[in-house]
């Protein structure tokens, strides 16, 4: 099961992802991004503390978020990733994009 929440902070948006971000949750996450992030023009922090699993589909969605933020000249940072997710970000050479 996948869930996403967003909190507006003073200088950024905090997105908390829960569960598994994979091919099965792509539609839910895409809808969340379209409804909650598309029209925002703020820096983004994505908290992965409760994200258990991510596959290549999920990684692709992170790349899309990065590109969207870059177009807006805003940053995106990932925090609290579990070791398995950190390792996947390093193996795929995208960890530097989200620091």
Which residues does each predicted region cover?
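Amphipathic alpha-helical interaction surfaces in cytosolic regulatory modules
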Residues: 21-97
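Short hydrophobic/aromatic patches at helix-to-coil boundaries
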Residues: 2-3, 95-99
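Short beta-strand/loop segment at the start of cytosolic alpha/beta domains
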Residues: 1-16
């Amino acid at each position: 099961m996948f869930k996403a929440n967003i909190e507006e902070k003073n200088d950024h948006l905090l997105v908390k992802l829960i569960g598994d971000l994979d091919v099965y949750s792509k539609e839910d996450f895409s809808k969340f991004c379209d409804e909650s992030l598309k029209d925002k023009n703020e820096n983004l922090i994505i908290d992965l503390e409760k994200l258990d699993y991510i596959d290549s589909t999920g990684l692709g969605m992170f790349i899309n978020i990065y590109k969207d933020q870059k177009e807006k000249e805003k940053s995106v940072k990932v925090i609290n990733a579990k070791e398995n997710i950190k390792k996947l970000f390093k193996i795929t050479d995208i960890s530097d994009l989200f620091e």
